[in-house]
UniProtKB/Swiss-Prot annotation:
Organism of origin: Penicillium chrysogenum
Keywords: Carbohydrate metabolism, Glycosidase, Hydrolase, Polysaccharide degradation, Secreted, Signal, Xylan degradation
EC number in record: 3.2.1.8
Listed SUPFAM superfamilies: (Trans)glycosidases
Taxonomic classification: Eukaryota, Fungi, Dikarya, Ascomycota, Pezizomycotina
Name of the protein in its database record: Endo-1,4-beta-xylanase
Recorded GO CC terms: extracellular region
Length: 353
């Protein structure tokens, strides 16, 4: 009897997952077998994660997993304003230097995060009311932090979370004092500080192509680019609820229409971490030519800011979830091609008997 297509697909999946089971512990896996290497094999720049001194010096499995599985790192907190310039003109780079040294030592691409953000902002900044003062403070902060790592970082999130849910600019000290011109000031200063770094605007809830927030992002970025503001990329944080991965493709495609060189998924975590949701997001990036990579926002669930939702690729025991192994397949098309190859092979043998 000739097996039907469902039986063939099931056989293919068994073979695929058997291969994953034999691949060895993820903390000791060779880089050539990593999820990052497989992502790069599909033409992308990286599949990364986050780190900081605290997490790197916590559970020893965290740095081991990062070294073996991810090709890019973003700092979770060490490059934010309250960490780098807690008092005016007094810069502290202890945490960020530790992070950068770890990333460089282990050959990881680095994304800087973040220069201008309304949150984790020292009160001495948020209390400024004078345009000239705030402009000078912004320029000095951006220039000093970026020059500390000039030539070492692939990209920077220059401005972060500047939109409300209706697509208008968020109320912050920057927008209140400078209006939307703070965006131009930030990006022009960043370009001068490190001309080689890719400069991003980054935000959350950009997960539906039809949402007012996403549409507001696209329209503003188009306008700013037309005015000469040097925005190279849009970062979609992609903090998702369960079942929301299916909309990722449409959302990334919509963001890509804004006219930037790049888009990226910058802070991925998904409630429940189902393989379906993670594969949907991976495929969304693979299918969008401007999407350069994905950064997962944490290694294992205990370290996540959403720990109670189990949103990451590694569980509380630092073991890989099904979503990690399935994501290694990288795309439905890749898996479907394997189904077809296996099916054709079996059918040809059956017909030749």
């Amino acid at each position: 009897m000739i097996p039907n297509i469902t039986q063939l697909k099931t056989a293919a999946l068994v073979m695929l997952f058997a291969g994953q089971a034999l691949s060895g512990p993820v903390e000791s896996r060779q880089a050539s077998e990593s999820i990052d290497a497989k992502f790069k094999a599909h033409g992308k720049k990286y599949l990364g994660n986050i780190a900081d001194q605290g997490t790197l010096n916590g559970n020893p499995k965290t740095p081991a997993i990062i070294k073996a599985n991810f090709g890019q790192l973003s700092p979770e907190n060490s490059m934010k304003w309250d960490a780098t310039e807690p008092s005016q003109g007094q810069f502290s780079f202890a945490g960020s230097d530790y992070f950068v040294e770890f990333a460089e030592t282990n050959g990881k691409l680095i994304r800087g995060h973040t220069l201008v953000w309304h949150s984790q902002l020292p009160s001495w900044v948020s209390s400024i009311t004078d345009k000239t003062t705030l402009t000078d403070v912004m320029k000095n902060h951006i220039t000093t932090v970026m020059k500390q790592y000039k030539g070492k970082l692939y990209a920077w999130d220059v401005v972060n979370e500047i939109f409300e849910e209706d697509g208008t600019l968020r109320d912050s000290v920057f927008s209140r004092v400078l209006g939307e011109d703070f965006v131009r000031i930030a990006f022009e200063t960043a370009r001068e500080a490190d001309p080689e770094a890719k400069l991003y605007i980054n935000d959350y809830n950009l997960d539906s192509a039809t949402s007012a927030k996403l549409q507001g992002m696209v329209s503003h970025v188009k306008k700013w680019i037309a005015a000469g503001v040097p925005i190279d990329g849009i970062g979609s944080q992609t903090h998702l609820g369960a079942g929301a991965g299916a909309a990722a493709s449409g959302a990334l495609n919509a963001l890509a229409s804004a006219g930037t060189e790049e888009v990226a998924v910058t802070e991925l975590d998904i409630a429940g971490a189902t393989s379906t949701d993670y594969v949907d997001v991976v495929n969304a990036c693979l299918d969008q030519p401007k999407c350069v990579g994905i950064t997962v926002w944490g290694v294992a669930d205990p370290d996540s800011w959403r720990a109670d939702e189990s949103p990451l690729l590694f569980d509380a025991s630092y073991n890989p979830k099904e979503a990690y192994n399935v994501s290694q397949l990288l795309s439905r098309q890749h898996a479907f091609d394997l189904y077809l190859k296996l099916g054709n092979l079996l059918l040809s043998r059956l017909h030749s008997d």
